């Protein structure tokens, strides 16, 4: 009797196991999904006969040269310490940032010199029509001068001397930093296309002013790349079944997004690197600096007492005593001199402050958006010619902008596609945006009120600046000669803020420790360069948030 009972119990325990195994076998017999078969139509993808072609083998975005992946998340943007300066321009707000990439270090003199060398070789400044392309990209080395300082050695040597090769570039204004970023995008993608066989070997060394590479042109008007030479000697080995050259497309997944300046929220998020104080889904405390300490000196046993950034320590003290240099430098120091933060980024506090993409306003308007916050959107589209094709910038039709300080800068390099602001064709009956230029969006000016009519009515009332919230000085924009320069001497200006002032973040070798806090924000006109502001690049991440999709207990 007992034996039969035990047998029944054992059989009952076995039943679920058999059922599970049977279920697994049935599931395994189901039809497998073929990645090269459309789940919409059942047609073949990437068939030799033709039809829809798509990169079904794409795994993950390639990490561009010099970049580090910053996994996105939520954080408190703004000052969490006492506002001793009473600026009231960085009130804490909760923001979320998408994953992105950022340069491991600031852009160095050597990196910028590579840019200048390329411009000089492709657009020789001794030829009149190209002169302003090269000259407009030159950093302002005179930023080192001071009426009561002997700094002429820095004026002559800092940019070009190999002793400063790995030091951060300075004397670069915001506009120049943006243009370097665009140039870098094209050079990186050009190398990728050559590596993957879409361009001829060493094609990038055979360019001149009439045959340069542009990522935008390659994607949208590929036959016009290299001034139309891509169909000949510049083309790669990849061909279709007819023997014609093939081009990489957005669907190929091999070209990288653009290098650009980071937004303010990206820069601050990356600088704070809160992963180091995270446990599971909560933060254990808060950070005052990019490192996990309330002090500017190391608390680790091996390096205890060492400074963790390059900054001004006191009046007349930029580096300590001879033989016992506190921060290893008087001015800037080589990148990677100090330990990185928890994201692996160097010099996010000290050395040089850094330009970010945003137009400055005292308030970060989290009521409008708390996701990828950015003030500065100006939406553009490709210019279309009379023949219905996109217009490619040539040496003959390149346009130049004259900045407020008289510096002349090329708007687009030859080989790029010309752009114009979007118009009613793109904004008609839209809810998410209504204008091309959104730099002053919802900043308290007349267009932000319920009585706002339309932009044309405002312009008809008088000057375009009459109704602006921030009534900044407007110096006369210089002409082609020095006599065209003039200052705004009116007495009714109330602010230095306008749509051409940009945020810069972080402390520098000239700043006291207060400015090392990543939440601090300052601004300057985008045409101004200094001896303490540099920059680094960022890049958007496409696809998944992280390379590894599993959670970790600690950052």
PLM regions and their residue ranges:
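N-terminal low-complexity, Pro/Thr/Ser-rich intrinsically disordered segments
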Residues: 42-60
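Bacterial N-terminal signal peptides that target proteins for export
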Residues: 4-17
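Functional-site microenvironments in short loops/helix caps that host divalent-cation chemistry
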Residues: 33-48, 69, 76, 81, ...
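Bacterial N-terminal signal peptides
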Residues: 16-24
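C-terminal motif of bacterial Sec signal peptides marking the signal peptidase cleavage site
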Residues: 26-28
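Short, P/G- and charge-enriched loop/turn segments at secondary-structure junctions
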Residues: 55-57, 87-90, 491, 521-526
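A short glycine-rich, aromatic-capped structural motif
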Residues: 59-152, 165-188, 350, 534-535, ...
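Catalytic loop of the DD-peptidase/beta-lactamase superfamily, centered on the K-T-G motif
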Residues: 520-528, 533, 539-540
